[in-house]
Structure formats: structure tokens, C-alpha cells
Amino acid sequence: MALIILLVACLSVVSADDCSGKTDAWTSIKGPKTGGYWLKQTTKTGENECTYVKGTDFKENTKTATYTYGYKDASGKLTKTTGTATAKGSDIVVGSDTSTVIYTDGKTCDVVKHGGHTELWVHSSKTSGGYNNCCDKKFTETRGSTPANEVYKKCPGMP
């Protein structure tokens, strides 16, 4: 009996730390359906500070949502653009842009590839930490030796 309990405990630890296979774009788009996501780090140089995305009007049957997104402009205000995000397997398509989900926990963070760059997105409630450690692992693993640039810095409240 003790052996069975030990095996179950070991398997629970392994599955709790399993960071593979969570690449569904629709799970990423929906997130927790409240708040939004800030771009925390990217391998792209010169990315605008306080880049964000916020989904609303989620349509399960078409796997689409309205996306509001933008960044902090020179005056310190957040820009605001609206588009439709569509999930296609592990791809998020907004207009002519496609991002590929490398990892999502559907609640606190996502790692995506966009335009050849790796990006770490963190839910607006987790900018000070507490997001899934698999996102840090996948971001580091995917970017390899490419330097990471911090994008989330003293950002105003999300619109």
C-alpha cells in the first residue's frame, strides 16, 4: 500500500511540472476571460513598452474574439487598436499577423512565437509574479541564447 501511495505522489509531481503539449490557441485567446495580458519579455529589440492585449466577445462556435491591443506611446498613454482574433490550432490570427502558441496555461501566461521572435505574455493580475513557472521555462527554452528584453515597465492600468 505504501508503494502505491509513493507512486501516486511521484506521478502527481511529474504531471504537475509537465510543461508540454499545451499549445491550443483558443485556450490562449480565452484565458480566464477577465483582465488582459501584458507582454513581459520578448527577444525582439526595440519593442514598445507596455504592449498589451485584451480579449472580449468570445465566440466558441467560430473560435474568435474581439482583441483590443496597443502599447504606451511617447506621451505615456496607451494606444488602442481593435481587431478580431481567430484560433486555428496553435495559431492566433489577427488580420495578416499570425502568432504560434508555444505554451499556454489558459490562466496566467502564454509563450508565443511572432515574427521570428519569442514572447512571454503575463496576465494583468500576475505582473508582479505568481504566474505558471512553465512559461519561464518555455520562454527560456524557446529563445535559446537570444537575449530577452523587458517590455513591462511601470505600465498604466489596462484599458
Curated annotation (Swiss-Prot):
The keyword Signal applies. Disulfide bonds join 50-155, 109-134. Residues 1-16 form the signal peptide. GO terms for biological process: symbiont-mediated perturbation of host defenses. It is found in: Secreted. GO terms for cellular component: extracellular region. It comes from the Eukaryota. One of its GO terms (molecular function) is amine binding. InterPro entries: Calycin, Tick_his-bd. The keyword Amino-acid biosynthesis does not apply. Not glycosylated. Belongs to the calycin superfamily. Histamine-binding salivary protein family. This is Allergen Arg r 1. The lineage of its organism: Eukaryota, Metazoa, Ecdysozoa, Arthropoda, Chelicerata.
